[in-house]
């Protein structure tokens, strides 16, 4: 069963899920290409305490709605005692569901949150390198505006990619975006998916690649460098709002992501969090 706020895996057969890799006109100097962030005077810093160590996060000024909301919830103690309820090795660790507080073992989580969502705040200079924090959300089928959950978030672990893998991702993402932006083609693709007609779907993909208005959106070189060295989850770029990054505690992500989980990706051993604002 698909839960609300559940992050989407992108596979070859799910090309009609939007996953943009457009380069835009980003200034490289705006991006920290070293991977893990550095504190700059005036940054808002958040501390996430866990049984496996602490993570210190700086929140981005470029995403003011998400920044203000996270600060508000942290100050209210909203996150204290909640779980990292969904962890997937080489992908991410997810938390912030209020239903996870004192949840019995085995309970499926991921549907909880405050009674509001946050408008997406995409910024091409903020992308899914290892160590960023981003907002979870409902899927595109019920949330085409990609609004964020009011409380649920995930921290990226990801993995490193080769140039060949990134080339394939560019093509898949570009095809997915093309399908999503053409309603009739989107409807046709959805029909093939529902009926399991893989040959027809594959033929549709090949025809799209031959269209004169189809272009592959390239991943900029500075992002490629990070995805090849530091790692991350490039297929999520411009689909989920990235609103901060770790400046300490990358090893904590790895420890939590490596835990044994149940069939719903919930750690067998509860991983509770405490979140506080330490510099504002």
Residue ranges of each PLM-predicted region?
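Cyclophilin-like peptidyl-prolyl cis-trans isomerases
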Residues: 21-280
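Bacterial Sec-dependent N-terminal signal peptides
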Residues: 1-31
């Amino acid at each position: 069963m698909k839960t609300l706020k559940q992050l989407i895996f992108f596979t070859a057969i799910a090309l009609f899920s939007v996953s943009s890799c457009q380069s835009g006109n980003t200034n490289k100097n705006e991006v920290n290409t070293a991977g893990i962030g550095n504190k700059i005077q005036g940054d808002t810093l958040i501390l996430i305490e866990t049984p496996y160590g602490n993570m210190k996060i700086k929140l981005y000024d470029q995403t003011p709605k998400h920044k203000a909301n996270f600060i508000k919830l942290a100050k209210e103690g909203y996150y204290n005692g909640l779980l990292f309820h969904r962890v997937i090795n080489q992908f991410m660790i997810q938390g912030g569901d209020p239903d996870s507080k004192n949840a019995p073992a085995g309970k499926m989580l991921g549907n909880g949150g405050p009674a509001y969502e946050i408008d997406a705040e995409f910024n091409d200079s903020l992308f899914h390198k290892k160590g960023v924090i981003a907002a979870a959300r409902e899927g595109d089928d019920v949330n085409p505006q990609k609004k964020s959950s009011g409380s649920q978030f995930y921290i990226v672990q990801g993995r490193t990619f080769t140039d060949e893998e990134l080339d394939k991702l560019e093509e898949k993402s570009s095809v997915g975006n093309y399908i999503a932006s053409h309603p009739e083609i989107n409807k046709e693709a959805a029909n093939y998916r529902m009926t399991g007609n893989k040959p027809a779907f594959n033929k549709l993909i090949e025809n799209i690649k031959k269209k004169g208005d189809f272009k592959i959106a390239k991943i900029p070189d500075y992002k490629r460098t990070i995805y090849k060295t530091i790692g991350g989850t490039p297929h999520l770029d411009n689909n989920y709002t990235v609103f901060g990054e770790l400046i300490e505690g990358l090893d904590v992500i790895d420890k939590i992501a490596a835990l044994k989980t149940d069939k719903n990706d919930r750690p067998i051993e509860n991983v509770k969090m405490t979140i506080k604002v330490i510099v504002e």
